[in-house]
């Protein structure tokens, strides 16, 4: 994904895998992407750090949510003062660097908006990471648009 972003979006980002989120280092990660149900393994301190980070402008993406119930509990713990809203990706992430051409919404997603900007994006029963690893062009374009959205809003 990052190579595609660099080559086609002319945006250069670094990534780290398996970070240990602490109060001291979280600001080093403006975009935090967590896969599957790994959000369930976060400590209460890490959840508090992420909540503060999101409120300060960080972007938190949860990929491939498999349980509405546990996800709802997590969101309530993370950001109790905000309501999650349904997100139609083609309405928000289209016409940035790339025009997206999905025949229909490829997955269900929701998020939390702060100051009219998506601060948390939850993707249900679909893995963007897998689509990127499989070099699916449409989802690589979507990934570039998501990052561009974050950087320009």
What are these regions (language model features)?
Residues 16-21, 43-49, 103-109:
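Alpha-helical scaffolding within the catalytic cores
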Residues 7, 55-56, 81:
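Residues at alpha-helix termini
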Residues 31-71:
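Short alpha-beta junction capping motif
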Residues 28, 55-56, 114-116:
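Short, well-ordered loop/turn elements at secondary-structure boundaries
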Residues 9-21, 62-65, 86-92:
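Surface-exposed patches in mature extracellular/periplasmic domains of secreted proteins
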Residues 67-149:
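An acidic, glycine-rich "communication" segment
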Residues 1-31, 35-38, 119-120, 127-128, ...:
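Aromatic-Pro/Gly-enriched surface loop or interdomain linker
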